[in-house]
């Protein structure tokens, strides 16, 4: 499920390198995420490793909408990916970051709770997440930054449900300001 990490050739801190995990949105592929983000160029210029794991099924997606075995499987996959990369490269365990677009941003959000002991910080663009308020019992704070436009037709800024092929289950997304404020207070 994971694409190959970039070939890291730049400077390191104490011989250890940073790892960035960049996750695609629903119905996208790792190669599209790589092209959208330009992380490879930045990684090669600044000496860190980036990897673009793939979600499951078709269309490709991360299971971020329901608490349950599918979500746990995706979290376990990312944890095992980190283990594999740490065994192959000298990854600094204090500098592992997750980011994503839309559904991949929702997965980064999930990792900020479920892998908070391994993830240093998360960055999300239009994160699609509809987990219930208070779903995360973990109290370790993980820094996050999120970007969301108020004209997004899929992840509605003021919350609600959009229909169509990208939301067949009619998921209801919370208002962005509300869930971000609640997350900051937890």
Regions found by a protein language model. Give the residues of each.
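Serine-hydrolase catalytic machinery in alpha/beta-hydrolase-like enzymes
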Residues: 1-6, 10-97, 107-110, 114, ...
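Alpha-helical structural signal in soluble globular domains
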Residues: 42, 114-118, 182, 186
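Active-site rim elements
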Residues: 64-69, 165-171
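Primarily recognizes the serine-hydrolase "nucleophile elbow" in alpha/beta-hydrolase
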Residues: 87-88, 94-142, 153
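Short beta-strand/loop motif that positions the catalytic acidic residue
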Residues: 146-148
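Phosphate/oxyanion-binding loops and surfaces in catalytic or ligand/nucleic-acid-binding neighborhoods
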Residues: 151-153, 186
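Conserved alpha/beta-hydrolase "acid-adjacent" motif
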Residues: 153-158, 164, 172-175
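Acidic, glycine-rich loop-and-strand cores that form catalytic or ligand-binding grooves
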Residues: 169-186
């Amino acid at each position: 499920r994971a694409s190959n990490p970039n070939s890291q050739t730049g400077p390191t801190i104490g011989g250890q390198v940073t790892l960035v995990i960049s996750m695609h949105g629903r119905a996208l592929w790792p190669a599209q995420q790589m092209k959208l983000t330009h992380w490879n160029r930045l990684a090669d210029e600044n000496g860190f490793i980036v990897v673009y794991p793939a979600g499951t099924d078709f269309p490709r997606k991360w299971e971020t909408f329901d608490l349950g075995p599918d979500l746990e499987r995706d979290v376990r996959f990312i944890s095992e990916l980190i283990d594999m990369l740490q065994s192959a490269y000298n990854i600094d365990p204090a500098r592992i970051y997750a980011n994503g677009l839309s559904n991949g941003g929702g997965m980064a959000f999930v990792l900020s709770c479920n892998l908070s002991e391994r993830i240093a910080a998360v960055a999300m663009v239009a994160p699609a997440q509809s987990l219930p308020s208070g779903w995360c019992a973990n109290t370790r704070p993980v820094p996050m930054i999120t970007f969301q436009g108020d004209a997004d037709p899929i992840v509605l800024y003021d919350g609600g449900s959009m229909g169509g092929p990208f939301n067949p289950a009619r998921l209801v997304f919370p208002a962005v300001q509300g869930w971000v404020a609640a997350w900051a207070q937890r």
